[in-house]
């Protein structure tokens, strides 16, 4: 116990020699004097006002979304209009017949090469056309028929432009077969598919066909005929 007290006193004496109390106190006093004193504390309400930048700020997200939506709708509308214009242009262009199509829509036939009492079959728009150079006897026979007895009443004069030339589409009005010329019970045309008989004016006289053979549009130009 005495030894511990002795050691404590020795250490205290050594510390006093190394750090004098007066100098340490004066140092601490000097350092305390340099600490500034706060006379007041600025609160949030005393702070200077911040500048207002609201007029320079972007609009709300809702306004921006609406602008983007309007822009997208406008762009899609413009693209749709352009596509529709191109489609209409292509559609109308397809209606403009080319020179080849116009040429195929007409058929020109030299009538001087068809002997009297004979038929000629030509192709027009993918269909056969019968051209008959009728004899005077055939013309007389065609005009002697009582049209009131016909299934499809039609005078011969209503079916020809010139009595000696009969021009018809060679398609049976029953189911579309091609009749045979100079055949049948009436000296005109006979359809072998279902037995329809046509006379020398191309009028239906017997069989299932409901109508006379059709007459195409045609014109005469000198010794030629233009079909179509």
Curated annotation (Swiss-Prot):
Annotated GO CC locations: mitochondrial inner membrane; mitochondrion; respiratory chain complex III
TM regions (residue ranges): 64-93
Entry note: cofactor: Binds 1 [2Fe-2S] cluster per subunit.
Residue pairs linked by disulfide bridges in the UniProt entry: 177-193
Transit peptide residue numbers: 1-26
Annotated localization: Mitochondrion inner membrane
Record: residues binding [2Fe-2S] cluster: 172, 174, 191, 194
Pfam families on file: Rieske, UCR_TM
Mitochondrial matrix side: 27-63
Keywords from the named record: 2Fe-2S, Disulfide bond, Electron transport, Iron, Iron-sulfur, Membrane, Metal-binding, Mitochondrion, Mitochondrion inner membrane, Respiratory chain, Transit peptide, Translocase, Transmembrane, Transmembrane helix, Transport
Segments in the Mitochondrial intermembrane topological domain: 94-228
Family (UniProt): Belongs to the Rieske iron-sulfur protein family.
Purpose: Component of the ubiquinol-cytochrome c oxidoreductase, a multisubunit transmembrane complex that is part of the mitochondrial electron transport chain which drives oxidative phosphorylation.
Miscellaneous section: The Rieske protein is a high potential 2Fe-2S protein.
Subunit text: Component of the ubiquinol-cytochrome c oxidoreductase (cytochrome b-c1 complex, complex III, CIII), a multisubunit enzyme composed of 3 respiratory subunits cytochrome b, cytochrome c1 and Rieske protein, 2 core protein subunits, and additional low-molecular weight protein subunits. The complex exists as an obligatory dimer and forms supercomplexes (SCs) in the inner mitochondrial membrane with cytochrome c oxidase (complex IV, CIV).
Protein name: Cytochrome b-c1 complex subunit Rieske, mitochondrial
Source organism per UniProt: Schizosaccharomyces pombe (strain 972 / ATCC 24843)
């Amino acid at each position: 116990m005495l030894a511990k007290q002795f050691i404590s006193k020795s250490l205290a004496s050594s510390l006093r020699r190394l750090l004098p109390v007066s100098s340490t106190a004066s140092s601490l006093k000097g350092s305390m004097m340099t600490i500034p004193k706060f006379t007041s504390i600025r609160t949030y309400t005393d702070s200077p006002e911040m500048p207002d930048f609201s007029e320079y700020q972007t609009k709300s997200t809702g306004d921006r979304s609406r602008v983007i939506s309007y822009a997208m709708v406008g762009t899609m509308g413009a693209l749709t209009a352009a596509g529709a214009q191109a489609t209409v242009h292509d559609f109308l262009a397809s209606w403009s017949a080319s020179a080849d199509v116009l040429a195929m829509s007409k058929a020109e036939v030299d009538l001087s090469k068809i002997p009297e009492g004979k038929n000629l079959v030509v192709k027009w728009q993918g269909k056969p056309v019968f051209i008959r150079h009728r004899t005077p006897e055939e013309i007389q026979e065609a005009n002697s028929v009582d049209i009131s007895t016909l299934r499809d009443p039609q005078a011969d004069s209503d079916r020809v432009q010139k009595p000696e030339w009969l021009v018809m589409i060679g398609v049976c009005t029953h189911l579309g077969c091609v009749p045979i010329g100079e055949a049948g019970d009436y000296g005109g045309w006979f359809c072998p598919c279902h037995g329809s008989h046509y006379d020398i004016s191309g009028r239906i006289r017997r069989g299932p066909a409901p109508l006379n053979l059709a007459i195409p549009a045609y014109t005469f130009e000198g010794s030629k005929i233009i079909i179509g």
